[in-house]
From Swiss-Prot:
Disruption phenotype: Cells lacking this gene accumulate tetracycline (TC) and abolish the production of chlorotetracycline (CTC). PANTHER family: FAD-BINDING DOMAIN-CONTAINING PROTEIN, FAD-BINDING PROTEIN. GO terms for molecular function: FAD binding; oxidoreductase activity. InterPro entries: FAD-bd, FAD/NAD-bd_sf, Flavin-dep_Halogenase_NPB. This is Tetracycline 7-halogenase. Pathway: Antibiotic biosynthesis. It comes from Kitasatospora aureofaciens.
């Protein structure tokens, strides 16, 4: 008798309520929520913990949604991932800090121009973000899920999935079976459910193209030590205090340090490169490491930053990484997060997207389990959200790769993305605040009531601006206009915008570093109070005292 069969026998052959394939962060957060609310959950995974995983960088919106699902569903361990300080205190000291998104523009053989950099400091109103050392965060949530009552099988290879009117049967390579009322596949690219049901789109509808080479390194210097920047052009916080993006024509490189704070105990740094495979075809004549260094050597500042670095784990080199699925929900199943599709680590949206899907799926799935009604229609919004998250992020990243050959065009992409991220994050934060104040979950459910599921700022005026951005970038890509002309039009739109948070400098293309201090956020709140757009008033208007309290600063 296998362990899995034994688990079900102890419960009188009663099926599990939900079987979750994949015990990474998405599977274990969902499993913890469901088990906390009294449902029987089985986690299946072909690997084990601790283990390496990608998705190490968080964003402000990730922190807010982590807090929201923790409070909404009563799982405090999830909130322990929602700030740098809480991760250090509750998970481990192996994580890095992330105070900012940093972008540095590069050309072959040239030093970077200090006037061609962009930094977006994460607003303290949402907290301090972290660089997740995923083997620790994932193991932490796995053990939390087990404590809440999830059963788990590691090293479990799924061979077959069979649905019938009463539920689902998962068969393992070891001959065991797991019976459940519902299945969630939270695995990844090699999703057993996507494979068996033929859900992968071939070819993918996604526009973005990139392949990847990555590893963990020691000996990575701070880029701050290797660029000569006049004092007046330096960013408000060091580049090394956050995630560094070295951007260049049709590609970018990430530097994600875990050792960038005084209490650091982890010497590692996550390093990788994304390359449009149409511009940079794979080099089978080179090892992954050799190919990586061939690109590092193109850019003098990056070469200096990595001069003393060496890899401490095997290199990974992929083909094109983008994939999508024709459906993500069905009768008694859901294909979740990276099992459904993937775009690119640019903008660090992976974990944020995962949390949004968990938030939308959890209450619907619990209601379906209680009512024994798994009609696909009740999960329709989850499908819309998953597909929307893929499609909007695909456009954003594709626009960015197009703009990476022309800094003024990239400058507009950066502003239109980052300004809306502040507004969209505040929308979620407001729902969390009102829910905590009233105990009324309708404020959280209202987040689902928007016309553009998956768009980080689902408001009409932002969609209009983003659509124009996409149209112009795609026209550049098709050769119908020049990057210079597209940049000129977008710069004018940015300057004339009535919603782009003027106190932060988003509508001034010469303000390269966005630093949301308390004084600036108070000015934004005052500006919003009399704004002609009701959405701006509703989302951003506040008193100076409320802003200071939210940012934890004294008058």
């Amino acid at each position: 008798m296998t362990d899995t069969t034994a688990d079900q026998t102890r419960h009188g052959d009663r099926p599990y309520d939900v079987v979750i394939i994949g015990s990474g962060l998405s599977g274990t957060m969902l499993g913890s929520i469901l088990a906390k609310h009294g449902f029987r959950i089985m986690l299946l995974d072909g690997a084990h913990h601790p283990r390496f995983a990608v998705g190490e960088s968080t964003i402000g919106q990730t922190l807010v949604v982590l807090r929201l699902i923790s409070d909404r569903y009563g799982v405090p361990e999830i909130a322990n991932l929602a700030s740098f300080q809480d991760v250090l205190a509750n998970v481990s000291s192996s994580h890095g800090q992330k105070s900012n998104f940093g972008f540095m523009f590069h050309r072959d053989g040239e030093e970077p121009d200090p006037n061609e950099t962009s930094q977006f400091r994460i607003p303290s109103i949402v907290g301090n973000a972290a660089h997740f050392f995923r083997q620790d965060t994932d193991s932490y949530m796995f053990h939390a899920a087990v404590r809440y009552g999830c059963d788990a099988r590691q090293y479990y290879r799924v061979e077959n999935i069979e649905f019938d009117d009463g539920g689902v049967t998962v068969s393992g390579a070891d001959g065991s079976t797991v019976r459940a009322r519902y299945l969630v596949d939270a695995s990844g690219f090699r999703s057993p459910l996507a494979r068996q049901l033929g859900l992968r789109e071939e070819p993918s509808r996604l526009k973005h193209h990139a392949r990847s080479i990555f590893t963990h390194m020691v000996g990575v210097d701070a880029i701050d030590d290797h660029v000569d920047t006049p004092a007046e052009l330096r960013p408000p916080v060091p580049w090394n205090d956050g995630t560094m993006h070295h951007i260049f024509e049709r590609g970018w490189m990430w530097i994600i340090p875990f050792n960038n704070h005084p209490g650091a105990t982890n010497p590692l740094c996550s390093v990788g490169i994304q390359l449009d495979e149409r511009r940079y075809p794979a080099r089978p004549d080179l090892t992954p490491e050799e190919e990586f260094w061939s690109h590092v050597d193109r850019f003098p500042a990056v070469q200096r930053q990595l001069k003393g670095a060496r890899s401490v784990r095997e290199w990974v080199r992929t083909d094109r990484m983008q994939y999508s699925s024709s459906r993500t929900v069905g009768e008694r199943w859901c294909l979740m997060s990276h099992a459904a599709g993937f775009i690119d680590p640019l903008f660090s949206r992976g974990l944020s997207n995962t949390c949004e899907i968990i938030n939308a799926l959890s209450w619907r799935l619990m209601a379906a389990l209680r009512e024994d009604d798994f009609a696909v229609e009740r999960f329709a919004y989850v499908e819309e959200l998953e597909q929307g998250l893929l499609d909007w992020n695909d456009k954003l990243v594709n626009n960015s790769f197009i703009s990476f050959s022309h800094y003024p065009l990239w400058n507009s992409v950066f502003r239109i993305w980052a300004s809306a991220s502040v507004i969209g994050g505040k929308r979620i934060l407001n729902a969390l605040t009102r829910t905590k104040e009233t105990g009324d979950d309708s404020h959280c459910q209202a987040l689902d009531d928007n016309p553009y599921p998956g768009l980080w700022c689902p408001l009409d005026f932002y969609k209009e601006a983003f659509d124009e951005l996409t149209e112009l970038c795609e026209a550049v890509d098709a050769g119908h206009t020049t990057a210079e002309e597209a940049a000129r039009v977008l710069e004018q739109r940015v300057r004339e915008s009535d919603w782009m948070l003027p106190a932060l400098g988003f509508n001034d293309p010469d303000t390269h570093h966005i630093n949301p201090t308390a004084d600036k956020m108070i000015r934004i709140a005052e500006w919003a109070t009399g704004h002609h757009r009701p959405e701006i008033r509703e989302l951003l208007a506040a008193s100076a005292e409320e802003v200071r309290a939210a940012m934890r600063v004294k008058p």
